[in-house]
């Protein structure tokens, strides 16, 4: 390439441990040699989050709001052991949760498929993209142990001072048990619907919403009704123009259908279903190291992309000791490619769009040509059968990707 591609504004968030090392390698070898970016960098490493009382996470989210594109490295969400390890002031919340709460939107997970990496569900030849409504329901519920006989009731007290309404949940007559009150909000469900419809249109794939509205007639029925109303009013004609469709399905039917399908659809899940099914689907495709995660805001304009996996602590401990590691960078690279592809779409930048696509193609072509990290070699041969000659280490693999990207872009005469 004789000159760099103009890329525009991107918010990048550095992370922790092994993924932080890989993140810098991706920028150095695959992004910055070819793309001139107006980078707005935020260090979301655990030490800096602690030093800034987590203000850096909020600042990063506000920057994504402003510039519409964010790419994020995996980060540590501290537990008690991490608080002790880093001598943290407190157990800071998940940065992903903080960013999601500020931006709103829905997290969509998508598998990266290579022909030579076996899938547990062999029929899945196209990705299944799961959108999880990461708000409310069990995750914001009030649950408690009922200590003995008595009534559990839920009361709604209107703000306008009108009559209270009380519902009997259960009359515990012969001893205690457990009870729970949970909720969701129309606004959040509407945002979830818009993000899901936007995602389906951007991929050109059909969309399914799964609920259990036959049992939770009012609660899940509300999800079904809001989706249908928004679809009919705002998206139906756009879907028909792309020859795709939207349907509501019962969750049990949907799970069965997903297993026997070939993939190639968007699956909008309520909070708990999305939590469970996204991991189930990820495993079905073979590897969390090959799973992207994209937060799409209801405006369809603001996007934050990251890898769906963690910081790969075990490899980082080996790296710190000077031992060889073979860490899979693909999902982190795809965070960059998806972010840049969205920047290209917003700016109508065909060169940047070509680059983002070429970067993804290089990743897949390199693996399909037999050059891969140890986790992928284990998917093919089974971990006990993997020999050192079957895989490249972290740095060798990054070099190989860099070499192949350079060749691909030279061929394209950009």
From Swiss-Prot:
Primary localisation category? cytoplasm
**Cofactor(s) this protein requires:** Mg(2+); Mn(2+)
Annotated GO biological processes are: 2-oxoglutarate metabolic process; female gonad development; glutathione metabolic process; glyoxylate cycle; isocitrate metabolic process; NADP metabolic process; NADPH regeneration; regulation of phospholipid biosynthetic process
Q: Name one GO molecular function term.
A: magnesium ion binding
Chain positions found as N6-succinyllysine: 126, 400
Cofactor remark: Binds 1 Mg(2+) or Mn(2+) ion per subunit.
| PTM text | The N-terminus is blocked.
- Matching Pfam families, A to Z? Iso_dh
Concerning InterPro entries, the annotation shows: IsoCit/isopropylmalate_DH_CS (IPR019818), Isocitrate_DH_NADP (IPR004790), IsoPropMal-DH-like_dom (IPR024084)
Q: Does the keyword Cell inner membrane apply?
A: no
UniProt binding sites for substrate: 77, 94-100, 109, 132, 212
Q: Where does NADP(+) bind?
A: 75-77, 82, 260, 310-315, 328
Site (Critical for catalysis): residue numbering on this chain: 139, 212
Carrying N6-acetyllysine, the residues are 81, 224, 233, 243, 321
Q: Which residues carry this modification: Phosphotyrosine?
A: 42
Which residues does the record give as Mn(2+) binding sites?
252, 275, 279
Q: Which residues carry this modification: Phosphoserine?
A: 389
Q: Which subcellular locations apply to this protein?
A: Cytoplasm, Cytosol; Peroxisome
Q: What does this protein do?
A: Catalyzes the NADP(+)-dependent oxidative decarboxylation of isocitrate (D-threo-isocitrate) to 2-ketoglutarate (2-oxoglutarate), which is required by other enzymes such as the phytanoyl-CoA dioxygenase. Plays a critical role in the generation of NADPH, an important cofactor in many biosynthesis pathways. May act as a corneal epithelial crystallin and may be involved in maintaining corneal epithelial transparency.
Complexes and interactors:
Homodimer.
Q: What is this protein called?
A: Isocitrate dehydrogenase [NADP] cytoplasmic
Which organism is this entry from?
A: Rattus norvegicus (Rat)
Gene name linked to the record: Idh1
């Amino acid at each position: 390439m004789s000159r760099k591609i103009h890329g525009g504004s991107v918010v990048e968030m550095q992370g922790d441990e092994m993924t932080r090392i890989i993140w810098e390698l991706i920028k150095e070898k695959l992004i910055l040699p070819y793309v001139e970016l107006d980078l707005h960098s935020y260090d979301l490493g655990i030490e800096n989050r602690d030093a800034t009382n987590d203000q850096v996470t909020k600042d990063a989210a506000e920057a994504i709001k402003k510039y519409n594109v964010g790419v994020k490295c995996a980060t540590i969400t501290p537990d008690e052991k991490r608080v002790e390890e880093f001598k943290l002031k407190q157990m800071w919340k998940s940065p992903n949760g903080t960013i999601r709460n500020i931006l709103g939107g829905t997290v969509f997970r998508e598998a990266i498929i290579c022909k030579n990496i076996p899938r547990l569900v062999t029929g899945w030849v196209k990705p299944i993209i799961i959108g999880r409504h990461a708000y409310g329901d069990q995750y914001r519920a009030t649950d408690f142990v009922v200590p003995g006989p008595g009534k559990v009731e839920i009361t709604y007290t209107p703000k306008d001072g009108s009559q209270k309404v009380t519902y009997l949940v259960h009359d515990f007559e012969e001893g205690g048990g457990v009870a729970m009150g949970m909720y969701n909000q129309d606004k959040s469900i509407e945002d979830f619907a818009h993000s899901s419809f936007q995602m389906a249109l951007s991929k050109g794939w059909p969309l399914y919403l799964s609920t259990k509205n036959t049992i939770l007639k009012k609660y899940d029925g509300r999800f079904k009704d809001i989706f249908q109303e928004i679809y009919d009013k705002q998206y139906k004609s756009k879907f028909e123009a792309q020859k795709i469709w939207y349907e509501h399905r019962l969750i049990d039917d949907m799970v069965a259908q997903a297993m026997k399908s070939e993939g190639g659809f968007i699956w909008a899940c309520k909070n708990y279903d999305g939590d469970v099914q996204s991991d189930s689907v990820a495993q079905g495709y073979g590897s969390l190291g090959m799973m992207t995660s994209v937060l799409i805001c209801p405006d369809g304009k603001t996007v934050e992309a990251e890898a769906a996996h963690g910081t790969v602590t075990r490899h980082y401990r080996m790296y710190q000791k000077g031992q060889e590691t073979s860490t899979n960078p693909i999902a982190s690279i795809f965070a960059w490619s998806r972010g840049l592809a969205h920047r290209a779409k917003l700016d109508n930048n065909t060169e940047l769009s070509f680059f983002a696509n070429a970067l993804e193609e290089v990743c897949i072509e390199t693996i399909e040509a037999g050059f891969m990290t140890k986790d992928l070699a284990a998917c093919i041969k089974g971990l006990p059968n993997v020999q050192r000659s079957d895989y490249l280490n972290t740095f060798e693999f990054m070099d190989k990707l860099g070499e192949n990207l350079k060749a691909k872009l030279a061929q394209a005469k950009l």
